[in-house]
């Protein structure tokens, strides 16, 4: 079975997201934990959560993926911004325990000319501050395109962050196809080699989710602009190879393409028809 979903609005709660996922043929979904700008999160509706968990179990959902606000920067040059990122992520992880054993994804951040080493140290320190031994949520570092001073533009940087985390069992990676293509990893022509490099640097056992996106920009452009499936520089054939790859096919895939629900439904149908497992 292809485990696939897309990014959904959380404005009407978990059950509504689950119902919308089912309407488009998905068995998982991604959502923002709060407004993308990082404002106060809505109170948890425990009855809504209970109904969602029942729906998810009944329909055999795989793990869902929470996404931290884009504006968080755990390696900012401004100490207040770093503290804010830690505060929000810690609160998010506390709230995630209402839906245990799922995934939480965040962008590592930008070092803003402090240097990559400083950025890596701040990010790993932030993770060491927020991770708890008894948490059930896996925290995922997202691979980035290398725009500006982003940290996480290559596998080495992700690996170094994880190396410095004390509770390594609670961290992993979310691989974004658009990002790594734009960062210079040739997933179109050399997918096996890219996965071998990931495995040697980080370990495929640390890969827990994939953002499945096409790219509006050419290879190694460091731009990060997502395109609908099959209409970008990555292309349908390469994305089909990814969902069918024996080292990846068991993972949950999350679409973040520029789409509404009907567009996501068409993409999910297209990818399901191309899935061979």
Swiss-Prot record:
Its EC number is 3.1.21.2. GO terms for molecular function: deoxyribonuclease IV (phage-T4-induced) activity; DNA binding; DNA-(apurinic or apyrimidinic site) endonuclease activity; phosphoric diester hydrolase activity; zinc ion binding. Zn(2+) 1 binds at residues 67, 107, 142. SUPFAM superfamilies: Xylose isomerase-like. Gene3D superfamilies: Divalent-metal-dependent TIM barrel enzymes. Pfam families: AP_endonuc_2 (PF01261). Binds 3 Zn(2+) ions. GO terms for biological process: base-excision repair. Its cofactor is Zn(2+). Zn(2+) 3 binds at residues 179, 224, 226. It catalyses: Endonucleolytic cleavage to 5'-phosphooligonucleotide end-products. Zn(2+) 2 binds at residues 142, 176, 211, 256. Keywords: DNA damage, DNA repair, Endonuclease, Hydrolase, Metal-binding, Nuclease, Zinc. It is an enzyme of class 3 (hydrolase). It comes from the Bacteria. Endonuclease IV plays a role in DNA repair. It cleaves phosphodiester bonds at apurinic or apyrimidinic (AP) sites, generating a 3'-hydroxyl group and a 5'-terminal sugar phosphate. Belongs to the AP endonuclease 2 family. HAMAP family: Nfo. This is Probable endonuclease 4. It comes from Clostridium botulinum (strain Alaska E43 / Type E3).
């Amino acid at each position: 079975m292809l485990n696939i979903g897309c990014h959904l609005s959380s404005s009407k709660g978990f059950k509504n997201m689950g119902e919308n996922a089912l309407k488009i043929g998905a068995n998982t979904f991604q959502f923002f934990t709060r407004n993308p700008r990082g404002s106060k999160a809505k109170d948890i509706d425990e009855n809504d959560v209970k109904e969602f968990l029942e729906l998810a179990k009944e329909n055999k959902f795989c793990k869902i993926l929470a996404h931290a606000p884009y504006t968080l920067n755990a390696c900012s040059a401004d100490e207040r911004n770093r503290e804010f990122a830690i505060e929000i992520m810690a609160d998010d992880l506390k709230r995630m325990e209402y839906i245990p054993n799922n995934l939480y994804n965040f962008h590592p951040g930008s070092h803003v000319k402090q240097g990559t080493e400083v950025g890596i140290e701040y990010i790993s320190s932030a993770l060491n501050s927020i991770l708890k031994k008894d948490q059930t949520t896996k925290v995922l570092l997202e691979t980035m395109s290398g725009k500006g001073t982003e940290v996480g533009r290559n596998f080495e940087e992700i690996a170094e962050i994880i190396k410095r985390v004390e509770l390594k069992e609670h961290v992993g990676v979310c691989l974004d196809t658009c990002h790594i293509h734009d960062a210079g990893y040739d997933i179109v022509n050399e997918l096996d080699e890219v996965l071998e490099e990931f495995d040697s640097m980080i370990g495929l056992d640390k890969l827990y989710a994939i953002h499945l996106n096409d790219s509006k920009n050419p290879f190694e452009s460091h731009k990060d602009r997502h395109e609908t499936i099959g209409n970008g520089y990555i292309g349908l054939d390469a994305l089909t190879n990814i969902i069918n790859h024996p080292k990846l096919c068991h993972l949950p895939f999350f679409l973040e393409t520029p789409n509404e629900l009907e567009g996501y439904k068409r993409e999910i149908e297209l990818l399901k028809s191309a899935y061979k497992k």
